[in-house]
Amino acid sequence: MSDMAMIRIGILIAGLLLVAAIFLFGRPKKSPQGRRVDKDEGQPRERREPVISSEFGVEDDAAERAEGVEQSELNLEGQDASGGNEVGKRPNQDFDKIVSLFVAAKAGQVLRGEDVVVAAEKTGLVFGHMNVFHRLVEGHPERGPIFSMASILKPGSFDMANIREMQTPAIAFFLTLPAPMTALDAWEKMLPTVQRMAELLDGVVLDDSRNALGRQRVAHIRDELRAYDRQHQAPPLTKSPRW
């Protein structure tokens, strides 16, 4: 299996778990499940985290489960998820749509933590809530993030104390809707940032299906977000009828 194929499988598993973790964190944790339950029993499958090898490929057991991986809560290993930093925290944890992109290292390479941090600062991202990076509304950080960026490797956060030792095959960018602006405007903020990050890190931009992001896919996402905005726009005000 090629390095890019392994990266895509890793993103498939870790990306889903990461997004769910960031927005489900803080809810009561479910009791750990001690065994894998057969589908015939009609019980939920055991939740397992992806196992990433030292070469940043997904090991066989996780690869076999890639197709059926669930969006489950990711264990943050007991650390304070916010690190005492509320910058980039969503004022409302409810969401109904997530749009994600990835910047992956080229075959045989990795993204170094120190380089990721420098690139993030150059593109206007700020370090904050959940120990990940966020793009905020200028002058209104209290409105929450326009989009966020995290590592695809467990636990997804950036440990600044050990950032020089950090390496990851890819980073994830996710736009969670509703956002502090229209969905289309938020996308137009995220896309050039992701593309610039890829340039700075000498990486490649992948879509949510782990394929190279192309013009056709970009156009399709824009159409989806226009439709989302139409569905969620406030109804027009009507005058009260005169009797």
UniProtKB/Swiss-Prot annotation:
Residues 30-89 are annotated as: Disordered. Residues 1-4 are periplasmic. Disulfide bonds: none annotated. It comes from the Bacteria. The gene is zipA. Keywords: Cell cycle, Cell division, Cell inner membrane, Cell membrane, Membrane, Transmembrane, Transmembrane helix. Interacts with FtsZ via their C-terminal domains. Residues 35-50 have a biased composition (Basic and acidic residues). GO terms for biological process: division septum assembly; FtsZ-dependent cytokinesis. PANTHER family: CELL DIVISION PROTEIN ZIPA (PTHR38685:SF1). It is found in: Cell inner membrane. One of its GO terms (cellular component) is plasma membrane. It comes from Xanthomonas euvesicatoria pv. vesicatoria (strain 85-10) (Xanthomonas campestris pv. vesicatoria). InterPro entries: Cell_div_ZipA, ZipA_FtsZ-bd_C, ZipA_FtsZ-bd_C_sf. This is Cell division protein ZipA.
